[in-house]
Each structure stands twice: as C-alpha cells, then as structure tokens.
Amino acid sequence: RGAARPGAQGRQAWRSWVTAKPIVPREQANRDIDQAISYYLSEDAEQAALGFIDAVEQAYAHLSLHPATGSPRYAHELNLPRLRCWPLARYPHLLFYVERPDHIDVWRVLHGQRDIPAWMQEPDDI
C-alpha cells in the first residue's frame, strides 16, 4: 500500500549523485570560531560551546552539499557579488563564504549583532 520509501541504501545511492565540495576556512574564520568557543567557556557554558561546534559542523556539512542555499544579502550591501551567508542553527552567528569551483571558501563566522560591514574587511580576491 502506498509508495515505497527509499531506505538507507536508496539515500546512499542518491547521495552518490551529489558531489560535496570541501570546506576551506580562512584563518580569520578559524579565529572567529575559537573566540566564540572561548566566550562560551568563559561564561561556564560548556554545553553551549559544544553545541556551537556542532552547529558549525552542521553548517559546513550542509554548505558542502548545497552551497547556493546561503543568502546573498550582504553581497549586495558590501558589493561582494559572490559572498553568501548562512545562519548557524540555535546560535546568533552567521557564516560568510564564497563558493569556488573546487571548494567553499569560508571567510568569517560572526555574531549577527556585530557591524558586519566593518568586520568583513578582506582582500579583494573574491
């Protein structure tokens, strides 16, 4: 009765058609992540720090498979045509990246309340 649903093997076969791009964070993005983790730990919020790490890993996994899903909102504001951002689940941070032909170039991971244009000062190699 009803249509058959794909099982684990069906999902794996489907995933083989999708090519994941490697995530390559810039040094500044890694520093942003380290600073956020340090902040949560300084507030005795170890679970929040661990959750933040999970949220970053989930964002990386998603963007690796679906890089075009990020918002181009700041691309227009900053006049950086290919810049996209993706919100971290359950955290007020945005992951800023550019899709390259062979990888995802992660620029920054910033708290959404920051002055994003001021924090996005990067070389013009987009």
List each model region and its residues.
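Basic, Lys/Arg-enriched alpha-helical interface segments
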Residues: 2, 9-83, 117-126
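Enriched for short, Lys/Arg-rich terminal
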Residues: 6-17, 88-126
